[in-house]
A protein has these predicted regions:
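Short beta-strand->loop
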Residues: 56-66, 138-143, 150-164
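A late-sequence structural motif
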Residues: 3-4, 153-187
Length: 187
């Protein structure tokens, strides 16, 4: 919600005071299940390129993963970091039930190594707090770099790893309010 979506949502809510938008934080698999049960009108998550049949996913904006590390980390002096340079680093990440954990495994394995996960925590803010304490590093969407995290620096990876944000919905069930929201988010 910190990226480009925040100002768009702010404007949409101001211009459409009669539209009630409820936010429910859930992992992508839970959002998809709720969409299938018609408990949600739309879901928003990263890299939603293969939703369930019958659902549409539209990219809201392009984003990339960055490496977040303690400000005194030796790699912090670099402008960009190759993924392979993280081979011997300890990672702080979300738990294995979260898509970020699976993502981290896949990305690191594509660079020829398995990540050494030292801590798993529930919230991205806690991940970044642990990074600031020097416990480890993490890969995180670039929208987090828009906020100040004392003791943490964000560096791009030499390889672009997409963290694009998508909205997923059923076009056949889209209400006029949802269509208006999607138009605002996509434009």
């Amino acid at each position: 919600m910190w990226g480009k979506m925040r100002p768009v949502m702010r404007r949409f809510l101001k211009e459409n005071p009669n539209v009630e938008v409820l936010f429910r934080e859930n992992m992508p698999a839970m959002q998809m299940a709720m969409l299938e049960r018609r408990e949600l009108d739309a879901g928003v998550w990263r890299m939603a390129t293969a939703p369930s049949p019958g659902f549409t996913s539209l990219r809201l904006h392009e984003s990339s993963f960055l490496v977040a590390m303690p400000e005194e980390h030796p790699l912090a002096a670099r402008k960009a970091t190759p993924l392979a340079a993280l081979r011997n680093e300890y990672f702080v990440t979300m738990p294995s039930i979260h898509t970020d954990w699976t993502f981290l495994q896949r990305v690191c394995q594509s660079a020829g190594f398995s990540p050494m996960i030292i801590r798993e925590v529930m919230e991205p803010q806690t991940v970044l707090a642990m990074v600031s304490m020097g416990i480890g590093i993490t890969l995180i969407a670039d929208s987090y770099a828009q906020m100040t995290w004392p003791g943490v620096v964000f560096r791009p990876l030499e390889e672009r790893i997409p963290a694009d944000l998508y909205i997923v919905y059923d076009q056949q069930q889209a209400t006029p309010a949802l269509e208006k929201l999607i138009a605002a988010l996509v434009n």
